[in-house]
Every structure is written in structure tokens, then in C-alpha cells.
Design a protein with these regions (language model features):
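Short helix/loop capping segments that flank catalytic or ligand/cofactor-binding pockets
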Residues: 155, 181, 241-243, 341-343
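Thiamine diphosphate
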Residues: 2-9, 16, 21, 32-199, 307-401, ...
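Conserved anion/nucleotide-ligand pocket segment
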Residues: 208-214, 218-244
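Short, glycine-/Ser/Thr-/acidic-enriched flexible segments
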Residues: 99-100, 150-151, 176-177, 206-208, ...
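Short, solvent-exposed amphipathic alpha-helical segments in soluble enzyme
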Residues: 109-111, 160-163, 188, 218-220, ...
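Conformationally flexible catalytic loops at phosphate/diphosphate-handling active centers
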Residues: 229-321
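Structural beta-sheet core signal
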Residues: 145, 171, 231-232, 332, ...
Length: 401
């Protein structure tokens, strides 16, 4: 029996014969035909994305803060935080997004891609982020992270352990509403949870404060007689998303690296860890400790907070600033974005012939008790505006004076 030797006829998916053998048409993932393919360039040198970061030179904090030329830029608070970190020689940053902080940590990721931050990753949630920051800081690296509102409360347990462990990490708190009715507008009630944990705490009014406080916070936190975490708080959206003028140093300089061996407590040797991290010390049995032993440690933490005053005065120019206090009929005492709104209230009062002074509080911990007592000695009326229901600032002011 004879067999047909005809060539097999190829058909398309519909069964029609393919009459021409043209090359198969390539398409992109959307199914559109690709009409041309660029040939790879020969001899092309790949650009190093870290080239600019590698050119940064280390300068002293004194030069960075007081001598380096500055240029004025119109940027958001998130961008100001990014530029501060760029110049701060940060070893590690860990992110977990939450509004209004998300943009800040996204921009820190850009810095990582450019080589200005050595290590960067996303944590699983805020508790994990703050715990990982604790471990990294204990190992001796300079750490930066940020959170906001509910994220602050979720990460609060590890955060409040930082001071007792004497960890000089820096966290930015972009304050927002934490309780119902939930909103993302500024409400800084979360600061009340941070005031008495032993952390040094600054409250920035605007984008310039955010830029300056972050860089200076690293240096203050790592001083040998301090060795404490620093929190830099700002009011979300009013600062993080709004734009303002910021005077910045050039990108080509950075702060000296952290010298962990200078700290008040030894760092953990990650290469040769102890066989048991939680050995029973002479002052405790398992997790039992007499309260007076715990209290002595807390007293030293708060003594270190007080010792930071001289460095705040040295690098930040004081815990407070005062405007038109002498001879004023009333004095407004505020921190954060309430300072900017207080200035507008003072302007309106001046139009009506009422002289009102302003005290801007930069440092919440340590709190400026002697400064307030001196500035308010002759005050007839004191008003404390703030964005929270518990009035944590008003209570501190009342206790101070």
C-alpha cells in the first residue's frame, strides 16, 4: 500500500492553512506586535548608581551644622527628612508604611538605591520594625525609622524598651489621629505615650526643624554620657506633605559614622555572641528583680536625659525660642505646627492692640523647666494651644511654672 509523501500543511489556531512561512511575529505582554528591537550597544559602560554617594566626604558636626554653606530649597517635610538622612551617614533603615509616614520611608528607599543608606528593608509590621531596630542598634550601627499614629502604638512595646537598653536609635513620628473617629489629620496624642519612657523627644514646627532635628538628633543621642534614643515628632500633613523653605548643606558631605565603642554600654558582638543572652545577673533571679534595682537603672536613664541638655543647647541653640515675651500682655506656649498657627493669632492680636508673646518649645524631653520659669515670671496670662484631647503640653507647662 502506497503512502502519501506530501509535506505536512501547517495551520493556524482556526484550522486555516498557513500559505507563507514568514518569520513569527513577536508581541509584547499586551499582545501588540513588536515592530523593532533595539540592538544592544557594544562597549557601553554601566553607570554606578552609588557613584555620588561614594564621593561624600565626612565632616565634623560643628562644620555641618554651623559652617557649611547652605542653599534654600522649597520641599515637603518627607523630602526634608530624606535629605537629612542623606547627610547623616545612616547604616540601616527599616520601613513599614503608614500614612502620613509612607512617603518618607519610600524616599529613604531611594537613598538606599543611590548608596547613601547602607542597608534597607521592609519589616512585617511596626512591632517587628522597632524590635529589629533595637537589635541593630545594640549591634552598633546607626539606625533610622519612622512611623505614625496607630503604628506608634503598635510598635510601642519595643520602642519604650530602647531607653532602658541605652540604644541611640532615631525614630521620626509623623503624628496623626489614633482613635475613633479615625482620621489622618494631625493629632499628636501619641506623643503622650512617649513622654515618660526615657527617650529624648523633639517636636518640630516645620520642614526646616525636621531637617535639622534629625541630623542633630543622631549626634546628641550618640554622646557617651547620653547614649539614648531620640524621637523627632512632627504633625502629619502640615509638615510631611506641605512644602516649606529649607536651608540645606550640599549633598557631598556627611556626618561622621557612629563610634559604638564610645557608648555608655557595650555593643553586642554579633560575630561572637554569648551562649546565653539572658543570663541571671547577680541582681535578679530569672525575670524577678527587686524594684529598687529597676528604679536605680531608670534613674540613670533620666539622668542621661538631663545630661543631653548641654548638647541640645550646643547644637540646637536651646530647648526653646522666645519672641516678644518682654512686656507682653499674654504668652502663647506651643510646640509643633501649633507654633505656626500661634504666630498668626499673635498677628491678629497685634492688629487689635494686644501684645502677645510666643514661646516655642523644641525639646519635650528634657523639658525646659528653668527656661519657662524665667520667661513666664511676669506673665499675666498663659495660653497653651495643642492638637490633642489630653493636653499633655499644658500639663507639663503648669507643672513647670
Amino acid at each position: 500500500m502506497s503512502e502519501s509523501l506530501e509535506a505536512e500543511v501547517k495551520t493556524n489556531p482556526q484550522g486555516d492553512p498557513i500559505t507563507s512561512m514568514e518569520p513569527e511575529q513577536k508581541t509584547n505582554p499586551q499582545g501588540d506586535p513588536i515592530t523593532s528591537v533595539a540592538a544592544p550597544k557594544t562597549g557601553e559602560v554601566k553607570k554606578d548608581p552609588h557613584a555620588e554617594a561614594k564621593k561624600q566626604r565626612i565632616v565634623t558636626p560643628e562644620y555641618m551644622f554651623f559652617e557649611a554653606p547652605r542653599t534654600k530649597e522649597f520641599i515637603t517635610g518627607s523630602e526634608a527628612a530624606k535629605e537629612a538622612v542623606r547627610r547623616s551617614n545612616v547604616d540601616l533603615s527599616i520601613a513599614y508604611p503608614i500614612t502620613p509616614q509612607s512617603e518618607t520611608m519610600q524616599l529613604i528607599g531611594v537613598l538606599y538605591g543611590e548608596g547613601y543608606v547602607k542597608e534597607y528593608y521592609r519589616g512585617e509590621e511596626e512591632y517587628g520594625v522597632m524590635s529589629a531596630i533595637a537589635g541593630a542598634s545594640r549591634a552598633g550601627v546607626r539606625c533610622f525609622t519612622a512611623t505614625a499614629g496607630p503604628g506608634t502604638l503598635r510598635g510601642l512595646e519595643p520602642i519604650v524598651s530602647w531607653p532602658g537598653h541605652r540604644l541611640p536609635a532615631l525614630a521620626m513620628f509623623t503624628c496623626r489621629v489614633v482613635n475613633a473617629p479615625l482620621a489622618i489629620q494631625p493629632d499628636n496624642i501619641e506623643i503622650s505615650y512617649l513622654l515618660n519612657c526615657g527617650m529624648i523627644l523633639f517636636h518640630g514646627e516645620n520642614q526646616q526643624d525636621l531637617f535639622d532635628f534629625i541630623m542633630k538628633g543622631f549626634i546628641i543621642s550618640e554622646k557617651n554620657d547620653v547614649t539614648l534614643p531620640v524621637g523627632v515628632a512632627c504633625d502629619g500633613f502640615f509638615v510631611t506633605h506641605a512644602r516649606g523653605y529649607v536651608h540645606m548643606q550640599e549633598k557631598g558631605i556627611k556626618l561622621p559614622p557612629r563610634e559604638a565603642w564610645r557608648g555608655a554600654v557595650p555593643v553586642l558582638d554579633a560575630e561572637n555572641p554569648p551562649a546565653r543572652l539572658s543570663r541571671d545577673a547577680p541582681v535578679q533571679k530569672s525575670n524577678f528583680m527587686a524594684y529598687n534595682i529597676h528604679a536605680v537603672w531608670q534613674q540613670e536613664v533620666w539622668a542621661a536625659v538631663e545630661r543631653s541638655r548641654k548638647y541640645i543647647n550646643q547644637y540646637m541653640g536651646g530647648l526653646v525660642t522666645a519672641e516678644n515675651v518682654e512686656g507682653a500682655d499674654a504668652i502663647l506656649i506651643a510646640s509643633g505646627s501649633a507654633v505656626a498657627q500661634s504666630r498668626e493669632a499673635i498677628r491678629l492680636c497685634k492688629d487689635k492692640g494686644i501684645q502677645v508673646g510666643l514661646i516655642k518649645i523644641r525639646s519635650l524631653r528634657p523639658f525646659p523647666i528653668p527656661e519657662l520659669r524665667q520667661l513666664c515670671a511676669k506673665a499675666k496670662l498663659i495660653v497653651v494651644p495643642e492638637f490633642n484631647y489630653v493636653a499633655w503640653l499644658a500639663k507639663d507647662v503648669a507643672a513647670a511654672i
